[in-house]
């Protein structure tokens, strides 16, 4: 059950359906996809509080400036990567303004060169489509095929912004809850990296 509105404001540069930040899940879930509802069910089960903004589809992190302000937490850049054999998969959470340097990332995790994974594997393992990639999708990775990797700057934040497996809503949750409640529940650990700002 949704706790209610906590703030309202115009976000002129983004086509929000609503310019309101809410506590918790939608009171009316009509038209919401099952994977989004499942995400709210898990967060509620784990007693993880969150704030939420509903909006039209947002395709890039660069388009999220006003959304960051409403949530009071920057959305991560989430990259879904794989090796050339498509046998090892990684979900990288990093600051949106950092540039992804493949060679440096691979060096830090001790992996051969990686590339962006095809959409079919994103759907297969995380039940997520491009633009909706989120750490919360690990709840769908029941066979543990995806290794989570988190940049140090994300880990040092008090909160993290992410999608509930669909990019028409964005959530803000406490980093502590992500690390101490959500990840143990979905039985995933993480590798820490420290990617450069260059």
Model regions and ranges:
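Extended, low-hydrophobicity, polar/charged segments
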Residues: 2-198
């Amino acid at each position: 059950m949704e706790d209610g509105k906590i703030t309202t404001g115009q976000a002129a540069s983004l086509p929000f359906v609503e310019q309101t930040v809410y506590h918790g899940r939608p009171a009316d879930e009509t038209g919401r996809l099952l994977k989004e509802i499942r995400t709210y069910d898990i967060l509620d089960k784990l007693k993880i509080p969150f704030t939420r903004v509903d909006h039209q589809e947002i395709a890039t992190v660069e388009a999220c400036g006003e959304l960051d302000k409403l949530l009071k937490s920057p959305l991560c850049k989430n990259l879904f990567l794989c090796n050339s054999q498509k046998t090892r998969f990684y979900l990288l959470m990093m600051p949106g303004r950092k540039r992804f340097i493949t060679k440096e990332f691979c060096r830090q995790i001790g992996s051969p060169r990686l590339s962006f994974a095809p959409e079919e594997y994103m759907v297969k393992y995380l039940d997520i489509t491009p633009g909706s990639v989120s750490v919360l999708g690990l709840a769908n990775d029941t066979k543990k095929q995806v290794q989570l990797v988190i940049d140090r700057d994300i880990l040092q934040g008090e909160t993290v912004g992410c999608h509930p497996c669909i990019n028409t809503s964005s959530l803000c949750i406490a980093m502590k809850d992500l690390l101490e409640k959500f990840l143990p529940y979905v039985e995933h650990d993480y590798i820490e990296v420290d990617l450069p700002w260059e």
